[in-house]
């Protein structure tokens, strides 16, 4: 399985990525091993993920979140609704 995931830190920064080993990747983020999130701190929490059988599907979904404002905004809205119950 491949996972597209969203992490959030205490300051509210979101990070979107994909991985075949979600648990290990989150630990990498929290330990500062991931260059792209090192400057954002180590206090990341997993707030959302999707699972895919195919790596290309996961890569394409991650790209859609990062490249399309409407897809990203829809994701943020869905996460807020889930967390806040709004």
Please provide the spans of the model-predicted regions.
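Structure-specific nucleic-acid interaction/processing domains
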Residues: 1-16, 20-86
């Amino acid at each position: 399985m491949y996972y597209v995931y969203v992490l959030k830190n205490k300051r509210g920064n979101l990070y979107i990525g994909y991985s075949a080993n979600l648990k290990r990747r989150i630990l990498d983020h929290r330990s500062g091993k991931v260059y792209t999130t090192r400057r954002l701190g180590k206090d990341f929490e997993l707030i959302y993920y999707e699972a895919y059988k195919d790596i290309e599907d996961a890569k394409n979904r991650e790209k859609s979140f990062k490249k399309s404002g409407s897809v990203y905004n829809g994701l943020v809205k869905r996460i807020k609704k889930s967390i806040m119950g709004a």
